[in-house]
């Protein structure tokens, strides 16, 4: 409902090697927005070939900033290198984070161990700071190894919100609305379904 008037979107990929693939994902997302009544007139994709002043302009003028999935740590380094974190943190428009993008929205971001995806150890690092907790996308409540050995120890210091696949959550300031799916709080060695 609050996106109906949006006309411009800026995408920030989580993978930069295959820009044709990124463009296909962007095209799919733009089509999805159109299907729900959001007709975007300006679509921008940031990458290493985008001039810095153009990046800044695209972020500042975007009605929607869409931080895509992909390589979480590489995306974080991209945001740091071009000094985009503060701009995204302070943006007045809508910010959407998917998978890696959701992780990077946190003040303290958590990239959990996933050997299948080339992440051999769980790390925490400074994220965008748009939200004051961290998101664990693709969360599987039955993955006890991840819960017991990775997430529970970290949950003593930070709140982790676990979002299983196909979950959508709308966050406004400190409030959230579950759009679809389940939403879990992992904190102080426990898991609570919200």
Annotate the PLM regions.
Residues 1-5, 11-27, 32, 111-194:
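C-terminal and late-domain segments of enzyme folds
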Residues 5, 37-39, 61, 156:
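Short loop/turn motifs at secondary-structure junctions
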Residues 8-15, 40-46:
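A short beta-strand-loop structural module common to alpha/beta enzyme folds
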Residues 10, 64-68, 96-97, 135:
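Structural motif
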Residues 24-46:
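Extended, compositionally biased flexible segments
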Residues 41-94:
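Flexible gly/pro-rich beta->alpha loop and the following alpha-helix that scaffold active-site loops
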Residues 42, 96-98, 161-163:
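A structural signal for short, well-ordered beta-strand segments and their strand-loop junctions
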Residues 74-78, 82-141:
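Class I SAM-dependent methyltransferase SAM-binding "motif I" and its flanking Rossmann-like core
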């Amino acid at each position: 409902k609050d996106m109906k008037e949006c006309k411009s979107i800026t995408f920030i990929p989580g993978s930069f090697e295959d820009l044709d693939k990124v463009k296909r994902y962007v095209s799919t997302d733009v089509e999805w927005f159109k299907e729900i009544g959001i007709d975007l007139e300006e679509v921008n994709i940031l990458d290493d070939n985008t001039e810095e002043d153009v990046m800044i302009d695209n972020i500042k003028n975007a009605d929607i900033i869409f931080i895509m999935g992909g390589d979480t740590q590489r995306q974080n380094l991209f945001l740091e290198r071009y000094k985009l974190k503060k701009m995204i943190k302070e943006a007045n428009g809508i910010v959407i984070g998917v998978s890696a993008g959701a992780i990077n929205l946190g003040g303290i971001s958590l990239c959990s161990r996933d050997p299948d995806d080339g992440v051999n150890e769980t790390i925490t690092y400074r994220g965008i700071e748009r939200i004051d907790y961290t998101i664990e996308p693709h969360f599987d409540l039955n993955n006890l190894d991840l819960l017991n050995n990775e997430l529970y120890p970290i949950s003593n210091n930070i709140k982790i919100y676990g979002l299983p696949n196909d979950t959508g959550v709308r966050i406004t300031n400190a409030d959230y609305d579950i759009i679809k799916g389940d939403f879990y709080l992992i904190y102080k060695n426990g898991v609570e379904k919200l």
